[in-house]
Structure formats: C-alpha cells, structure tokens
C-alpha cells in the first residue's frame, strides 16, 4: 500500500489475469515474442509489447550491478498528450505526478536525468486553530502500520522533541486516504507550525530521479522525453504488425 506501507501478499497467494484493457493495450499474439518455459513444455512471453509508456506511468526503482534507477510516475493523460504532440512534431514537456498527492516543484527536474531533483510537499490543512491535518503525503513516504512504524510520523515527533515545533500529540486516522492529525499546544501558532513542519520534517523532501533503462539489451541513461519518443516509435511499429 503506497499510503500505509503495508506489504503485498506473498507471491504464492497472488494470481494475475489480464483485463480487457490490458489484452488490447499490453498483449497481442501477433506482436508478442515467445520463448520456451523453464521445462520446455510451454511457451511464455519474452516481454509484453505495451502500446503506451507504462514505465513512465507507474515509475520504477531498483539497483543492480553498480547501476541504480529511479523513474518517477507520470500522469497517463499527460503522457498521451505528450505522445500526440510528438506525433505532430510539436514540443512537449513531461513532469512527475504522484499517486500520494502533495505539491511538487519541478523547476530542477532536468527531464528525469541524473543530477535533477524535485521537491515534494505534503498537503497540510487547518481543521481549527489548534489542529492541523495532513491529507496528502510526499511520494515515497508512508503513514506506517503497527509492524512497520512510519519514518514520516517519526520525523514529526523528533522535531517536537528537539523543540522545532510545539505539539501535544499526533493522531493517525489513515484509511483509504491519508489523514494525520497534529494537535498543537495552547501556545503554538498554526501558521508557524506549518512552516516548521515543511522546514524540519519529512513534510517536504527532495527526490533525485535517475532515468537508467535497458535499451537494445544495454543499460543507458535517457531523459523521460527520450523514453516517450522511443515508445511512440515502437508503438507505430506494433500497429503496423497488427494489420
């Protein structure tokens, strides 16, 4: 769970079935390359030829053999608009869009390349003069569970211990959506506390992207715009094969 941090069920309990959308967009027997399964009795896809840049839509993160990758998620509608602009020979720009919400500063995004960075802020609301509510959290942070405490909430408690903010307690009411209530002390200012939360806790964080992908069986560093262009070109080839 991207909000609470709950782990997925064990692999032996998970079964996947392609939806009608996936059958149309992700899988096609005419364009899918196959190989023998581990025992040679069946065939399995080498890769599913997706007709849109799924990598940019859901993002990816990992590290292996001295290379690390961190591709941030993007809005599917904006990806489609950018693809249409590319087909028309027009300029386009792609910026991250996080499922956990919050606001984002993309001025140094650098098209997803190494050396770029984005700043992400939680959404903090005033419920009353002595109660603040965090309803959207920065991407990559979680509200935590009983077995996996939240470093996000811990950062608020530690700031209080150091005297950076003055709060009575933190109440986590997260369910389908994030909801963390921060109850202030009688002498605390809500406006100053919000400023301090952004300055001294994980309510504001910096994320550094690194668009490292496998292209032609070799790792390479691309921009997210390059990934989109490559995907559009590949999709055109797939559509020609389907005819």
For the regions a language model picked out, list residue spans one by one.
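C-terminal interaction appendages of subunits in large macromolecular complexes
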Residues: 5, 9-16, 20-21, 25, ...
């Amino acid at each position: 769970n991207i909000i609470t941090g709950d782990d997925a069920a064990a692999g032996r309990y998970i079964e996947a079935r392609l939806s009608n959308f996936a059958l149309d967009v992700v899988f096609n027997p005419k364009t899918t390359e196959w190989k023998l399964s581990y025992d040679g009795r069946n065939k399995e896809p080498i890769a599913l030829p997706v007709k849109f840049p799924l990598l940019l839509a859901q993002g990816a993160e990992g590290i292996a053999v001295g290379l690390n990758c961190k591709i941030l998620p993007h809005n599917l509608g904006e990806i489609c608009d950018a693809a249409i602009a590319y087909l028309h020979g027009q300029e386009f720009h792609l910026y991250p869009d996080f499922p956990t919400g919050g606001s984002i500063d993309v001025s140094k995004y650098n098209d997803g390349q190494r050396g770029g960075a984005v700043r992400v802020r939680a959404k903090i609301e005033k419920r009353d003069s002595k109660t603040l509510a965090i309803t959207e959290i920065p991407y990559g942070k979680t509200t935590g569970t009983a077995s996996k405490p939240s470093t996000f909430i811990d950062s608020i408690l530690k700031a209080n211990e150091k005297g950076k903010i003055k709060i009575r307690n933190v109440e986590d009411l997260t369910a389908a959506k994030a909801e963390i209530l921060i109850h202030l002390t009688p002498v605390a200012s809500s406006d100053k506390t919000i400023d301090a939360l952004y300055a001294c806790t994980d309510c504001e964080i910096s994320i550094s992207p690194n668009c490292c992908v496998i292209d032609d069986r070799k790792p390479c560093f691309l921009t997210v715009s390059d990934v989109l262009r490559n995907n559009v070109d590949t999709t055109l080839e797939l559509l020609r094969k389907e005819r």
